[in-house]
Structures are given as C-alpha cells and as structure tokens.
C-alpha cells in the first residue's frame, strides 16, 4: 500500500514505523528527517518527480512516499465487543470516509464499520483520515440491513441519520 504527503508520512514515522516497508524520496529533505528514516533500516529510494508522481497516482506527494504493509480490516466480531461504534452506510468517497474517521477518532469512537460498499481505497482513506484509521478499528460489511440485525442482536442501540432529512 502506498501513502504519500508530508503529514501522513510523518504520522506513520512517529506512530507506526512497523508498517513501513520502503521509503521513496523525490527531493532533498531535512537531515534530521532523513536520519529518522535511515534508522529504520528500510530501503530508501531516491526517485525523480515523474516516478514519484506515478507512485502517488498524481497526488500531492510533497516529495515523501512510503510503501506500507497491507492494511488489515478489524474482524467484525471484535468490533461487536466495543461500546461505541460508528456505521457508515454506502459511503464510498475516500475524502468523506477519512474526514469522518478523523472526527470519530477524536471523539472517542471505539470502532467504525463501512457497510454496503464493494471496494474502498485503503491508501486514500488512510491518507485522508490523517492516519486515524491506523488507530481506529475498522471493518467492512457487505449489507447494512444484515449488519443492523447483527448489531441489535449484540445488544447495540442504533441511532441513524440521513442527509435526506
């Protein structure tokens, strides 16, 4: 999984070094930051801007790109044991999911479930969440109706909101 951009790269360097597999730099960086990368004993690649743009799929990489180990979703059974969870029904936009994850994490939500989606961009969602999804348990469920039944059976009280009013 590729992530890019100064803020998320610094967050991963600070909190989740164990996830870093490779480092890609497309410009000169501060010597202190470079020494932090060097201490990880991971392969550091100096790449031109064209290669960096390809790795970041055109995103604003700011010269900093990391290859991380694969993201693993939290099993639903683990989230069902939590007290305060948030369910996102049918949301697919990585910017929206990331922003909601940041807010949920800061408000003390224990876990988050995305329901009624087929696929999600893990790297984009983690990047837009500013790393919150690396610390917030996150699961995916294929059907929101079935998920609601499972959560009620597990003792949850469901509260819903819709943008339709």
Labelled PLM ranges:
Residues 81-165:
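RNA substrate-binding interface of SAM-dependent RNA methyltransferases
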Residues 1-77:
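N-terminal positively charged helical leader segments and presequences
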């Amino acid at each position: 999984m590729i992530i890019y951009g100064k803020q998320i790269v610094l967050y991963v360097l600070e909190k989740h070094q164990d996830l870093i597999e490779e480092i890609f730099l497309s410009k000169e960086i501060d010597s202190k930051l470079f020494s932090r990368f060097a201490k990880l004993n991971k392969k550091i690649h100096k790449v031109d801007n064209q290669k960096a743009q390809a790795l970041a799929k055109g995103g604003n990489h700011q010269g900093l790109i990391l290859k991380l180990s694969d993201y693993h979703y939290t099993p639903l059974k683990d989230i069902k044991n939590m007290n305060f969870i948030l369910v996102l029904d049918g949301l697919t936009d990585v910017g929206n999911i990331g922003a909601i994850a940041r807010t949920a994490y800061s408000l003390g939500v224990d876990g988050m479930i995305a329901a009624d989606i087929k696929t999600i961009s893990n790297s984009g969602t983690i990047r837009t969440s500013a790393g919150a999804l690396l610390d917030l348990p996150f699961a995916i469920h294929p059907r929101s109706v079935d998920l609601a039944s499972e959560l009620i059976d597990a003792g949850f009280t469901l509260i819903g909101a819709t943008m339709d009013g």
